[in-house]
Amino acid sequence: MLDARAIQKPWLSPWWAALVRCAEKGGHTGLDIVERVSAGRATGWPTASGYLVLERTEDRKLRIWLGVGRDVRRWCGEAERLVSDFARSVDCRALLIEGRRGWRRILPHWTPKGEDLELDLTR
């Protein structure tokens, strides 16, 4: 569970429509986002020119569940650093993201784990 004071509501973001489209590509809906955030399992995360939805997993990992925006290569490094710090602050030991080819190119230092990529935060 995430601290309610730290949770940002993605549906208040100008990126909301893009987040819903991204969720739908993965078989989810806007309602799924609202329910997970409202339950304290997920939070929105604004970036320089995009938006992420982060979800805490049962095994102490923080999953970058949804991501939209422009010029991801420009802001990805800073977002990774900030999200990693946040993950540690909520007692998570790794970051996860779906291992699509594009992410594999942008995040070559992440470890493939099945269909996902993982960044160990315990080192």
Which stretches of residues belong to each language-model region?
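Short intrinsically disordered terminal tails
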Residues: M1, T122-R123
